[in-house]
Amino acid sequence: MAAAPPIEPAVTTTFPGFKFSPTDIELISYYLKRKMDGLERSVEIIPEVEIYNFEPWDLPDKSIVKSDSEWFFFCARGKKYPHGSQNRRATKIGYWKATGKERNVKSGSEVIGTKRTLVFHIGRAPKGGRTEWLMHEYCMIGVSLDALVICRLRRNTEFQGSTIQKPPQPSLPLDKHVNLRNEAISESIYGWETMVDFYLSSESGQELLSEIAESSQSSQNPQVPSEEDFYADILRDEIVKLDDPAVSGNTLINVPRLQTESNTTRVLPLPDMVDKQMQSLLQKLPLQNDTGEENNISMSNCFIGIYSIKSINRARWDVVVWLLVMIAVLVFYLV
């Protein structure tokens, strides 16, 4: 009597109530171990497929056991580089990205293998878009990196937008669609930098930068006495009174010092126009004056010179205030 032909795995799936749902321990200790030992007929219900040569939505059709939730495959882990340690996980339009840590699978107290979870992303790392396709990769302990593994493919039905099983074919508009979210984030982050760069590249921005650099350099470098400081010291120090007759040698008079609101004295360099005014003022002073009328004229000329210096200081304060306003506007745009 001839022996009955073996029942094909595809035939057994047609019976109602049949469901192929092995546990993690069964996948490693029975199916994967028997496959690596060469016992092909006892594990032929799980086909061997090069998973990374296909997209995840094409793999369910290659499964022997038909299902709507999970599918199982044997797959050899290929290396990304011939002499490297990374596994090849890229497909034509996407890649499988490992999430979380590699977990141990125990049978009792003995570790028999490892389990790793991967998620499929469309695009290229690191800007790929996550999909609803998940995969658990089971590997035995003590085998090489390119050894055979079992892959449990699943589709997360609760994932947003998972009603579309197959995304459209990749093209230039698809790549732009994948990067829309990243472009929106980068636009909000770098928008103010573009505005500041545009302002600083203009003529007014360059002038502002040069003024800030000059002010910082002048605050760091000490003032070197110059010819302009010499006339400022003349107004601050005591001046020989040349208008009065010499009674007991040269008589000195006190000239009011230029002081700021904080009663501190600063050496401010005077422009060339003030130098010319001081020189002309000193030339007009007579050596001796016997009349009180000419004395009053000389003193009035001195006060005119002092008033001119105060006007110069006021103009310098206007420049400082303008510079502070420009810095405040720049900080406002930066914030």
Swiss-Prot record:
The membrane spanning regions, by residue number, are 315-335
- Topological relation to the membrane, as annotated: Single-pass membrane protein
Q: Where is the NAC domain?
A: 14-156
Give the main location. membrane
UniProt subcellular location: Membrane; Nucleus
Q: Which SUPFAM superfamilies did the record assign?
A: NAC domain
**What keywords were assigned to this record?**
Activator, DNA-binding, Membrane, Nucleus, Stress response, Transcription, Transcription regulation, Transmembrane, Transmembrane helix
Q: What induces it?
A: By glucose. Induced by salt, drought stress and methyl methanesulfonate (MMS) treatment.
One GO molecular function term? DNA binding
* Domain comment in the entry: The NAC domain includes a DNA binding domain and a dimerization domain.
Q: What does this protein do?
A: Transcriptional activator activated by proteolytic cleavage through regulated intramembrane proteolysis (RIP). Transcription factor involved in modulation of abscisic acid (ABA) signaling. Attenuates ABA sensitivity and glucose-induced ABA accumulation. Reduces the expression of ABI4 gene.
- Listed name of the protein: NAC domain-containing protein 60
Q: Which organism is it from?
A: Arabidopsis thaliana
Q: What is the lineage of its organism?
A: Eukaryota, Viridiplantae, Streptophyta, Embryophyta, Tracheophyta
